[in-house]
């Protein structure tokens, strides 16, 4: 993490993440998230935003702060359920957001539980307006999208090039539908390509694959073919991320 921050210093903006993945990644009986009081866990997250991220990701046996500060809080939920552990992580995220002004980025399983996520965040003092719900293309319900956007949240469509889930044309058509209804300020685009199979450079020894550039070289041109204006494309790629991922002071 620190190596990445130093390597790209002065070359671009990298937003580091604090927080938790969905609950299934943690032991419900012995993990840090499960055993430590919510407000104490939140203090550790707040420190990663305000002071610097721990070099060892809080794996112990001591905390060593770095110069790199977190700029986004992550939490995650399961398919059609928010487990007790995930509710706790959402409470931690909301408390951290309230104290730091840092945005929340949510993993959703197949785009489910979006409304319930916002309920949990708001209940604990967080803001839907500073919350991004990711992987939403996997649940292609346009009116469900509208109900979430009407609460001020941002939706991220982040899986073009993953036809096993949804085809690019369907994702693009749903984006167009939302744009036609005035939601252009609440949509961001991305590539959920954190694993090796999503990074072309890691697969050169195997064969040809698309990487992060697919968003700009294939998906954005598809939006243009569907008559999405350059202004709206710029909003989704530049302005909206800049706004929602800014830290409120």
PLM segments and residue spans:
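Divalent metal-coordination and catalytic microenvironments
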Residues: 97, 155, 192, 233, ...
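Helix-coil boundary/capping segments in enzymes
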Residues: 1-36, 128, 135-137, 168-169, ...
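Active-site gating/metal-coordination segments in enzymes
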Residues: 10-15, 20-103, 154, 160-164
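Catalytic pocket-lining loop regions of alpha/beta-barrel enzymes
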Residues: 94, 98-180
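Histidine/acidic-residue-rich catalytic or RNA/ligand-binding cores of hydrolases
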Residues: 26, 113-121, 141-149, 165-175, ...
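Mid-to-C-terminal alpha-helical segments outside catalytic/metal-binding sites
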Residues: 213-249
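Active-site beta-loop-alpha junctions enriched in small/polar residues
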Residues: 19-23, 78, 109-111, 136-139, ...
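Short acidic/histidine-rich active-site segments
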Residues: 105, 158-160, 183-206, 233
């Amino acid at each position: 993490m620190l190596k990445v921050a130093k390597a790209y210093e002065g070359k671009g903006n990298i937003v580091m993440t604090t927080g938790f993945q969905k609950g299934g990644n943690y032991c419900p009986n012995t993990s840090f998230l499960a055993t430590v009081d919510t407000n104490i866990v939140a203090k550790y997250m707040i420190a990663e935003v305000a002071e610097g991220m721990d070099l060892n990701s809080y794996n112990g046996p001591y905390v060593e702060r770095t110069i790199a500060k977190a700029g986004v809080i992550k939490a995650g939920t399961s398919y059609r359920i928010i487990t007790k552990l995930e509710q706790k992580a959402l409470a931690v995220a909301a408390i951290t957001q309230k104290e730091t002004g840092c945005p929340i980025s949510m993993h959703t399983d197949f785009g489910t539980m979006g409304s319930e996520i916002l309920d949990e965040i708001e209940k604990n003092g967080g803001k839907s307006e500073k919350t991004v719900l990711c992987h939403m293309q996997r649940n292609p319900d346009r009116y469900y999208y509208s109900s979430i956007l009407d609460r001020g949240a941002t939706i991220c469509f982040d899986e073009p090039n993953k036809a096993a889930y949804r085809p690019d044309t369907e994702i693009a058509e749903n984006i167009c539908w939302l744009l036609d209804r005035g939601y252009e300020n609440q949509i961001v685009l991305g590539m959920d390509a954190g694993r090796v199979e999503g990074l072309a450079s890691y697969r050169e020894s195997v064969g040809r694959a698309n990487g992060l550039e697919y968003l700009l070289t294939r998906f954005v041109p598809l939006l243009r073919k569907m008559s999405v204006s350059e202004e709206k494309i710029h909003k989704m790629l530049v302005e909206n991320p800049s706004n929602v991922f800014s830290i409120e002071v």
